[in-house]
């Protein structure tokens, strides 16, 4: 891998000499095994020209067996129809696809997009959240587009093994032009049991909060969080003229 995309991404440069999908990846262990977790994979897709490509984050258990994968793929070399796929694997390695979301048509004509894919497991409930940005028109990532969420229940508890290892992987299809897809980041968090009566922490020290009045969006660390806003539902419909935003507690946030 080499640093690419204006110093933000990491690009695969050497691919195996084989047929079909060929790729390169890097793997590392987590500081500790995680029972409940939230894992987000962030990638950039160069889709100005047509081509086939895929990139994914793989999650392994303590025995090194594949537990889950979250990834983005454009499998048709002559079309720009990408989709996000989440797959779980049982102890035997049998795959179970629980999410397959195809880009909305508004994404087809964009030259460069940033894709976020999040998989969260708490108990036997898996939550998936995906969103994207137009990296050309919105380089600061203030206006999330093509957002989607889904929940899936592991009724048989076949996918409850602790997560211990992660890997980032990028691939192209041998014989066809590569639609370049590069990883931008992997964010892996253990979810600890919440004490009784405790509230979820939405904003923490160091978080970057962006409120866009024109786009009517609230983004925290590039994640759409409008559903978590505590201000009135008519906040974005204030008449033109003087308005004031009050942030509490005072002297805490750097604005």
Where are these regions (language model features)?
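Carbohydrate-binding surfaces in secreted/extracellular proteins
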Residues: 39-41, 107-156, 217-220
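Secretory/extracellular carbohydrate-interaction modules
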Residues: 1-95
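Short, aromatic/His-centered strand-loop micro-motif at the edge of beta-sheets
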Residues: 84-118
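C-terminal interaction-tip segments
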Residues: 251-255
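Surface-exposed loop/edge segments in extracytoplasmic proteins
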Residues: 65-69, 95-97, 135-149, 225-227
């Amino acid at each position: 891998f080499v640093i690419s995309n204006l110093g933000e991404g990491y690009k695969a440069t050497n691919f195996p000499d084989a047929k079909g999908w060929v790729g390169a990846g890097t793997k590392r262990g987590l500081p500790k095994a995680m029972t409940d977790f939230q894992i987000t994979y962030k990638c950039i897709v160069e889709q100005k020209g047509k081509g086939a490509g895929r990139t994914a984050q793989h999650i392994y258990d303590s025995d090194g067996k594949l537990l889950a994968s979250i990834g983005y793929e454009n499998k048709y070399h002559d079309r720009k129809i990408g989709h996000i796929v989440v797959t779980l694997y049982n102890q035997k390695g049998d795959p179970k696809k629980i999410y397959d979301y195809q880009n909305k048509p508004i994404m087809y004509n964009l030259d460069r997009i940033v894709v976020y894919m999040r998989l969260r497991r708490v108990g036997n409930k898996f939550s998936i959240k995906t969103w994207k940005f137009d990296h050309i028109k919105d380089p600061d990532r203030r206006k999330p587009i093509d957002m989607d969420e889904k929940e899936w229940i592991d009724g048989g508890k076949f996918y409850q093994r602790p997560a211990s290892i992660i890997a980032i992987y990028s691939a192209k299809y041998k014989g066809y032009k590569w639609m370049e897809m590069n990883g931008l980041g992997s964010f892996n968090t253990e979810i600890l049991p919440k004490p009784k009566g405790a509230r979820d922490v939405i904003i923490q020290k160091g978080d970057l909060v962006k409120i866009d009045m024109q786009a009517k969006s609230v983004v925290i660390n590039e994640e759409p969080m409008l559903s978590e806003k505590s201000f009135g539902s008519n906040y974005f419909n204030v008449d033109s003229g003087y308005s004031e935003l009050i942030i509490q507690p005072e002297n805490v946030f750097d604005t």
